[in-house]
Amino acid sequence: MCFDKKIHGVAALTTHILAVLAIFSSEFSLPTWENIQVLLIGTILCRGPRRISSVLRVMGLASVRNFSKYHRVLSRAEWNSLALAKILFGLLIKLLPESWPILIAVDETLERRRGKKIKAKGVYRDAVRSTQSKVVTSFGLKWECMMLIVPLPWCKRSWALPFLTLLAPSKKSNEKAGRRHKTSLDWTRQMVKLISRWLKKSWILVGDGAYACMDLAATCIKQNVTLISRLRLDAQLFEFPVYEEKKLGRKRIKGKRIYLKNILVDQKQIWQTGIVNWYGGEKKTIEYLTFICLWYHAGIPPIPLRIVLVKTPNGKSEAETFFSTNVNLDPVQIINYFVLRWNIEVTFEETRAHLGVETQRQWSDKAIARTTPLLMGLYSFVTLVAFKMNQIKALASIEAASWYDKKGELTFSDILALVRRDILFKKHFSKSENKPDLRKCTDKMINALIYQLSIAA
């Protein structure tokens, strides 16, 4: 591990950043590690597009001649992104309270990119621009993301902290490269197996309706993972078989078909009420119906599920159906876990707004596969640094004023601003180690600071 004072980035490494960053040093060679420190601090301080050129300007290295070494960190340097993901995951696990389960949300996101050299790109449905009546498609890269749901002391809402992000190349690009195409569910199954090897204990996976797949559910059960997702009303659900004594032949593997739509209109059904944690931190009273059944499709062994039918609180749409592969899980808790999944959507938006996801312009295959996972991981890294800061002194928004009180609720933009403030104070305004006088800022430091203040957000 090297933290040489002569390195441009090290002068801005605060004690809180060092406490988190030092753990990753073993995964890099010494030259790469020195460059990583510069890029890390520059990316945190940078506003707007996160490009190597922008990062170097922020760090006062606009006139450096061997700038290509910083580009090679992403495009050529030898380091393992999965090893970094494992270390980051281990750090995030330590943030969980003892009573909090290991709850991981999975989802895919589209990074809009164009260009002939972007080999893995494809044409996908753009969830942000599409509506229920109109589908909008965009060129781009599809990423599969795993995020740990963590409650944090400065916010009532739990945060989804990314730790594992994988590129899912399009079918056309795989065919052109002669590779077997993997769907989003294939990548998810692979990620489930990887995380289970890391944890070596049970955990919970939450995904939207796109992850309501029998193959994924079967994989989760084998890996001692509970899958929670939304189910279609026309899903093939069956009662448990009734075995008749003294009857010859193969035993039945399923009973009568269960039609969810018929259950919804059945007046004999007794609906229960429960209070759940709803979106926005509110409490909602819902009506729900729960039962255990079998999920079956030809060629796949039947899977026992806990089904929860929920009447929407606003009553504007038909009932929603949720399921859990753990049939012993409380139905209200299943809804609470699924509601927490929405935090992954918040993280996607905040990484675009504050960390420059979709603004990078790398075109080499290795750099593309590394840059977005690093930016997603930076979201968690900044949160870890802020958590260290909060342990010493409770964090408060720097935007607080006599006319504006955030009442203790901090967003990621607040956290990022506090970490930036800590870095800038250490870099430009901290006292000298040997003398009580303030360190004089060089022209390069002043120009870099003025550049940060003057550029558009």
How should each PLM-predicted stretch be described?
Residues I36-Q37, I52-L56, A85-K86, F348-H354:
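Short coil/turn segments at secondary-structure boundaries
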Residues C2-F24, F28, T32, M59, ...:
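Single, function-defining residue in the core of a domain
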